Amino acid sequence: MRAMPLSIGTIHFVGIAGIGMSGIAEVLHNLGYSVQGSDLSENANVARLRAAGIPVAIGHDAANLGNAQVVVVSTAVPRDNPEVQAARKRMIPVVRRAEMLGELMRLRWSVAIGGTHGKTTTTSLVAAVLEGAGLDPTVINGGIINAYGTNARLGGGDWMVVEADESDGSFLRLPAVIAVVTNMDPEHLDHWGSAEAMEAGYRQFVSNIPFYGFAVLCIDHPGVQRMIPDLSDHRLITYGLSPQADVRAERIMSDRNGATFEVRLSERVAGRERVLAPMRLPMLGNHNVQNALAAIAIGIEMEVPEVDLRAALASFRGVKRRFTKTGEVAGITVIDDYGHHPVEIAAVLRAARQAGARDVIAVVQPHRYTRLATLFEDFCTCMNDAGKVIVADVYPAGEEPIPGIDRDALVEGLRARGHKSVVSLGSPDHLAEMINAMARAGDYVVCLGAGSITNWAQALPNQLQALIETTRRGAGGMR
């Protein structure tokens, strides 16, 4: 396959530390291209890229371009960005992130994973299955894969696994041989305009695969199932918990360390079925069993031996900020999770219940005013598996506030719909005291959101420990 010439010159990434941009930059660098970039602030991704040998400037300034011959931007970068303006003035090509990802994908046979939820975990699981089979895949993911310590991996094999971003429609540019759709829920309607237009985008995503490829679709989701009649000219494999799935999980047994399940394979044309011996997945929640089924379906189609499938799942180490345990203090378990859509929040809280939690305390930081406004009713009804809910201020992610759409509106909305215990968080500084007062041994404290709440989740175990020790010392002094 024909690749971009290494002589193309230095490639400059505006916003290089973004989770989508950093993976592409890292793989290009490892392939031998000259890569540099800029970002607004110091963070873990900046440090990781610098450690890999990629220069990163802090702040956006025309001077950061240096001798760059190509500039890569995401849709989050505004047209008036000084580096973008300087590139256009110098007639340097300005390339969208998805276009550059598409160029990378032309170097390999590619698997693209799309969907509203579960993309990052499914991408990681597919990568684990292909790696376990000795196929040495290249991987570009939307989250940090714990086994790699990064969101990107340059492999020497013929396959690439990528997370496909539907938020701006750019996944339609990706030249995939295998397409996965995990689910479809209303999201990013600022781009799509309507749920119907979004579903049409997913149909096009699947339709773009070549005749020698195939699509893997989660039949459990009504929106995904609705697509099937329109895709009858393509090779389709369905998966899920439904009896109608080609690759189906049965006899799911959950414990605090994960799930064990059998897999029933159905060949619709031949009319045959077979059941694989039980699989073990060290992740909580039926939604993660569904994610694993997508990887199993791809592995079966690619003739990965069953023993390798089983080993890959059993040894899977997860993804950062996907039900990540940050600590346990006095029997209280603290979880950090990226979930910020009502469907994700409900699935994560259900998983905490499946883990055997005595009670579940949800700490929720709504992400973006527009999302809270668009999905307000869903936010008000997605937390029933939490015995107690603490609601923080909205993380704006650059948005302006919307009157009547804020922390207090969500608190009142939850109460009005019958939730028995909902309180607001005045400041992150008060979180540890609130948790110390309401949590007991055996409880799970689940911190949910795509914003700064991850920092609170990381700090909370030590803060709780300090409060407990202070209380003990005080009690000892009174004797």
UniProtKB/Swiss-Prot annotation:
The UniProt entry, under SUPFAM superfamilies, shows:
MurCD N-terminal domain, MurD-like peptide ligases, catalytic domain, MurD-like peptide ligases, peptide-binding domain
Which reaction(s) does its UniProt entry say it catalyses?
Answer: UDP-N-acetyl-alpha-D-muramate + L-alanine + ATP = UDP-N-acetyl-alpha-D-muramoyl-L-alanine + ADP + phosphate + H(+)
Q: Which residues bind ATP?
A: G115, T116, H117, G118, K119, T120, T121
Its annotated pathway?
Cell wall biogenesis; peptidoglycan biosynthesis
Respond yes or no to whether keyword Cytoplasm is given for this record.
yes
Give the Pfam families listed for this entry: Mur_ligase, Mur_ligase_C, Mur_ligase_M
Q: What are its GO cellular component terms?
A: cytoplasm
Q: Which InterPro entries match?
A: Mur-like_cat_sf, Mur_ligase_C, Mur_ligase_C_dom_sf, Mur_ligase_cen, Mur_ligase_N, MurCDEF_pg_biosynth, UDP-N-AcMur_Ala_ligase_MurC
Keyword hit for Cell division: yes
Q: What class of enzyme is it?
A: ligase
- GO biological process terms, semicolon-separated: cell division; cell wall organization; peptidoglycan biosynthetic process; regulation of cell shape
Q: Where in the cell is it found?
A: Cytoplasm
- EC number of this enzyme: 6.3.2.8
Keywords attached to this entry: ATP-binding, Cell cycle, Cell division, Cell shape, Cell wall biogenesis/degradation, Cytoplasm, Ligase, Nucleotide-binding, Peptidoglycan synthesis
UniProt GO MF annotations? ATP binding; UDP-N-acetylmuramate-L-alanine ligase activity
NCBIfam families (UniProt xref): murC
**Function of the protein:** Cell wall formation.
Question: What does the sequence similarity comment in the record state about its family?
Answer: Belongs to the MurCDEF family.
- Sorted alphabetically, which HAMAP family does this protein's record hold? MurC
This protein is called: UDP-N-acetylmuramate--L-alanine ligase
Q: Which organism is it from?
A: Acidiphilium cryptum (strain JF-5)
Source species taxonomy: Bacteria, Pseudomonadati, Pseudomonadota, Alphaproteobacteria, Acetobacterales
The gene name reads murC
